[in-house]
């Protein structure tokens, strides 16, 4: 039976817990909005839309609490990026200017990372790489393994784009190490895909396929269609390189079943072209030509041009 004394006892316990939380100081959060900022950051990776909603409800003071405003500005930058909201660099500049001079490696790394992201998006690749590399140094001082994965992946991708394959591999391996420590299966799968791309660019196709297959396995076990289709699509191309044509065609078909996109329609059509199955190639490449993505459409037209050198589709009179 619940008595009045039971309610008083429960109330006392709750009061003690709240008092303990209030007295516990986390150096990552200024005191005024500590609960809201902590809650938003805790939700950032899994529920970025909810994190954004919380941050939008906070009205920090500007200049009386510099740390408070810098923290809010940094998390708001992160939330907007994760929700694919276009933004200027005004908020990240506030966060960067504050945290770059503080003894907080996690905040410094996060600010440097998003400075790099926004510089990269505005086509300043050298600046972006410089920020990423500095962020990579700072993140090694922390246990934020999810951020460590993201930072090292960006560095690796920039080196891979420049065909600096050994440097790319070094950072992809760091990204994989961080992904494993974070136990984030999505990040682990993408780290395998990135390592596979580096092996592919080094023309070590069998090693690349080995790592793509690891990503595919994670996609299958965890029902991650985006990862599964992406890895299978890229592996299909490598199977053509290694002469495993049946596997190449099957993977290309499976990608369409998982999720049909213009790029995957093109890939299937181009696989048929490579195998000299021109009727099927013509069918899918014509669809890909209608893509609003100029790169996909251009590739499809180019593939059709190559086909025209060997094949003329039969037109039926009506």
Give the residues covered by each predicted segment.
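Bacterial N-terminal signal peptides
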Residues: 11-19
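A "functional boundary" signal
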Residues: 5, 20-318
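Bacterial N-terminal signal peptides that target proteins for export
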Residues: 2-11
């Amino acid at each position: 039976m619940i008595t009045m004394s039971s309610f008083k006892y429960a109330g006392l316990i709750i009061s003690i817990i709240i008092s303990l939380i209030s007295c516990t100081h986390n150096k990552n959060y200024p005191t005024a909005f500590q609960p809201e900022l902590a809650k938003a950051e805790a939700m950032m990776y899994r529920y970025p839309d909810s994190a954004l909603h919380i941050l939008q409800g906070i009205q920090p003071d500007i200049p009386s609490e510099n740390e408070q405003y810098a923290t809010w500005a940094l998390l708001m930058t992160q939330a907007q990026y994760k929700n694919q909201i276009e933004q200027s660099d005004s908020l990240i500049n506030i966060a960067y200017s504050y945290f770059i001079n503080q003894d907080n490696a996690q905040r410094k790394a996060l600010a440097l990372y998003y400075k790099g992201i926004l510089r990269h998006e505005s086509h300043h690749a050298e600046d972006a790489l410089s920020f990423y590399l500095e962020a990579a140094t700072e993140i090694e001082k922390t246990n934020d393994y999810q951020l460590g994965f993201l930072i090292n992946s960006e560095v690796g991708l920039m080196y891979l784009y420049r065909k600096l394959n050994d440097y790319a591999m070094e950072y992809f391996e760091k990204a994989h190490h961080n992904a494993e420590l974070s136990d984030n299966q999505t990040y682990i799968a993408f780290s395998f895909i990135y390592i596979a791309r580096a092996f592919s660019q080094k023309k070590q196709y069998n090693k690349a396929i080995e790592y793509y297959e690891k990503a595919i396995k994670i996609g299958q076990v965890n029902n991650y269609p985006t990862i599964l289709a992406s890895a299978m699509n890229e592996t299909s191309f490598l199977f053509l390189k290694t002469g495993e044509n049946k596997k190449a065609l099957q993977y290309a078909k499976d990608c369409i079943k998982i999720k049909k996109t213009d790029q995957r329609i093109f890939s299937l059509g181009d696989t048929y072209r490579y195998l000299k199955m021109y009727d099927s190639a013509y069918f899918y490449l014509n669809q890909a030509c209608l893509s609003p993505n100029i790169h996909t459409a251009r590739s499809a037209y180019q593939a059709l041009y190559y086909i025209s050198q060997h094949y003329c589709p039969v037109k039926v009179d009506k």
